[in-house]
Amino acid sequence: MNTNQSNPNTDLTDDANIEHTLHRLLTQANNHFDDTVKIDGQSLDLGKDLEQVMMDNLDCTDIFDSDIASQKHLTLESLFNDEHNTDSSTLLEMQRSANDSLVGIDLDRHKKGYTGKASLDKSTNQNNVHKPDKEQKNYKIDKPTIKKKKSLLKTTNEPMLSPASLSPSSSLASSDANESHLKIESMITDITSKIDSARQDIVSATKPAKFTNEFTISQISEMKARIINTHKLLLNFNFIKEGYARSCIQLKKSMDSLKDSEIHRAHLLVENDDLKQQILELTQKLNEKSSKES
């Protein structure tokens, strides 16, 4: 433990010493993990490592420390007002530190053999010994330690890897950092332009027309016209109702007359049959008389 704490200037020419130093610094930065959990270098999740590195960098930046010291209220307007004041070099430095941390995590993950196991044992022992110190510091990260970590990692001459290049479906190189930064700035400007346009629409809105006297007068005249139209509709309905009643009475009368005509027709048919019978009888009598005379 003492050798790990008192030897920050380890010879970086040796690959094993570099990996030991990287792992020690990363375990010191991530001192808020539970020491009781056994760490397996092969079972770590890349998403969790990326999230942890980004959180560490956000905690260690001077921008957020100055905001906290000045008790600045983080609102939507303050964030949009301060977007142009943010130094691009600070953002690039944050991305470089995140990339360097990811390089160290990747080296520890793919490392096999006794060296990786020994480094994990040393890191767990060191975390167990310094657990009271971590409780007193309220899990704060030491800034000099972060600066030492950055200086040691820069001397390794490893290529910088962006978070997008670590994903399996990505083919971006480390030179695309500036392009991603420009894309983020363009997205922020688009959002601010939309918010400004919405504010202008709200300010330029005039007084609603329903609170004016002209609108009240027009509503009264419209109500009068509706009342008159409703009265006309009622009169038309009554007229139609009376016409329907008259047509029903006439239909009843026509049905009665039709019934009477049918009865009269039946009587005429009966009388016609009687007359036919009488004619037949008379013709027979006439024929009989003519035969007797001859």
Swiss-Prot record:
Subcellular localization(s) per the UniProt record: Cytoplasm; Nucleus
Source lineage: Eukaryota, Fungi, Dikarya, Ascomycota, Saccharomycotina
Low complexity composition bias: residue spans: 153-175
Keywords: Cytoplasm, Nucleus, Phosphoprotein
Basic and acidic residues bias spans: 130-145
Principal location listed in the UniProt entry: cytoplasm
Gene name linked to the record: ATC1
Job of this protein: Involved in cation homeostasis and in the regulation of the cation stress signaling cascades. Also involved in bipolar budding.
Species the sequence originates in: Saccharomyces cerevisiae (strain ATCC 204508 / S288c) (Baker's yeast)
Entry's Gene Ontology cellular component terms: cytoplasm; nucleus
Coiled-coil regions listed in the entry: none
GO biological process terms, semicolon-separated: bipolar cellular bud site selection; intracellular monoatomic cation homeostasis
Superkingdom classification of source: Eukaryota
Renumbered residue ranges of the record's region Disordered: 114-178
Further comment: Present with 846 molecules/cell in log phase SD medium.
Name recorded for this polypeptide: Protein ATC1/LIC4
The UniProt record lists the keyword Cytoplasm: yes
